[in-house]
């Protein structure tokens, strides 16, 4: 393992976050810490993961898309952010692409993603 990868692995271990195994096409619920004045609360953001970038490194991120009041809303989250309280996989999607940007142009039934029924988690 080279020096940079070793430093990144140490930083990720230091954060001590339990990140579930998810990929593009999965419906996920992200608990994001929001600070309003002096109060802090957790706001849930649920939608379809349309992309993951950066692998599992410290700078990795993922994009979640949802439809809110008839408008498509996308949000990019850093995977190892301290503001992320929790990531929960709601539903596994069956897709053949790593990036689902084509969903931006689709509405209604054509934007549906089939559910994956035979999911096997990665063994470490």
UniProtKB/Swiss-Prot annotation:
PROSITE patterns: RIBOSOMAL_L19 (PS01015). One of its GO terms (cellular component) is cytosolic large ribosomal subunit. InterPro entries: Ribosomal_bL19 (IPR001857), Ribosomal_bL19_CS (IPR018257), Ribosomal_bL19_sf (IPR038657), Translation_prot_SH3-like_sf (IPR008991). Keywords: Ribonucleoprotein, Ribosomal protein. The keyword Ribonucleoprotein applies. One of its GO terms (molecular function) is structural constituent of ribosome. Gene3D superfamilies: 2.30.30.790. Disulfide bonds: none annotated. GO terms for biological process: translation. It comes from the Bacteria. Belongs to the bacterial ribosomal protein bL19 family. This is Large ribosomal subunit protein bL19.
